[in-house]
């Protein structure tokens, strides 16, 4: 199984990339994390947020791995603890499908994409920069894996 992070946004600053890379390189080969950056749509010329999100949805759908479980990150999603993520991970591995976590653009994710998602997940109740979400998600995936392996990284 492979974990994909599809993120609408521009190239991130070096410190974000460095933090993200730190956690992705710690993951075992059977749970590699792959980042797919999706170029955001411009919101210019009176273009509505709805049309921007719809255009970004098309780009996201084109980048989604075929048959992948879709986990959409959204401020109105379910609030999972790290332990809940760790409990979900083995089940996802057993069903054999890749998992794609989607981080929307500045206006969020298109409602059609959210309705199609297998899971709507909230990373935080706080508003976070999208680059920071990449790092936090990668860290939480590593932490969840470490819990399933009784690795000393996670100390509860």
Swiss-Prot record:
Q: Which GO terms describe its cellular component?
A: cytoplasm
Reply yes or no: does the keyword tRNA-binding apply.
no
Write down the HAMAP family for this protein, in alphabetical order.
23SrRNA_methyltr_H (MF_00658)
Family matches, as CDD domains: RlmH-like
The entry describes its oligomerization and partners as: Homodimer.
Report the source organism.
Burkholderia lata (strain ATCC 17760 / DSM 23089 / LMG 22485 / NCIMB 9086 / R18194 / 383)
By its UniProt entry, which PANTHER family does this protein fall under?
METHYLTRANSFERASE, RIBOSOMAL RNA LARGE SUBUNIT METHYLTRANSFERASE H
GO molecular function ontology, one term from the record = rRNA (pseudouridine-N3-)-methyltransferase activity
Biological function: Specifically methylates the pseudouridine at position 1915 (m3Psi1915) in 23S rRNA.
Sorted alphabetically, which keywords does the UniProt record give?
A: Cytoplasm, Methyltransferase, rRNA processing, S-adenosyl-L-methionine, Transferase
Tell me the disulfide pairings in this chain: none
Protein name (database record):
Ribosomal RNA large subunit methyltransferase H
What SUPFAM superfamilies does this protein map onto? alpha/beta knot
Q: What class of enzyme is it?
A: transferase
Which residues are S-adenosyl-L-methionine-binding?
Answer: 73, 104, 123-128
Pfam assignment, any one: SPOUT_MTase
**What family does this chain come from, according to its entry?**
Belongs to the RNA methyltransferase RlmH family.
User: Cross-referenced InterPro entries, in alphabetical order?
Assistant: Alpha/beta_knot_MTases (IPR029028), RlmH-like (IPR003742), tRNA_m1G_MTases_N (IPR029026)
């Amino acid at each position: 199984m492979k974990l994909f992070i599809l993120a609408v946004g521009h190239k991130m600053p070096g410190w974000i990339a460095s933090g993200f890379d730190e956690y992705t390189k710690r993951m075992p080969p059977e749970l590699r994390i792959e980042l797919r950056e999706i170029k955001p749509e411009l919101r210019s010329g009176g273009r509505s947020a709805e049309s921007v999100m719809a255009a970004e949805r098309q780009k996201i759908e084109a980048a989604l791995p075929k048959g992948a479980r879709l986990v959409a990150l959204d401020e109105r999603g379910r609030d999972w603890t790290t332990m809940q993520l760790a409990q979900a991970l083995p089940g996802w591995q057993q069903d054999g499908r890749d998992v794609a976590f989607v981080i929307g653009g500045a206006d969020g994710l298109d409602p059609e994409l959210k309705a199609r998602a297998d899971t709507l997940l909230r990373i935080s109740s706080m508003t976070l920069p999208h680059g920071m979400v990449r790092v936090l998600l990668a860290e939480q995936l590593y932490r969840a894996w470490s819990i399933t392996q009784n690795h000393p990284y996670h100390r509860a």
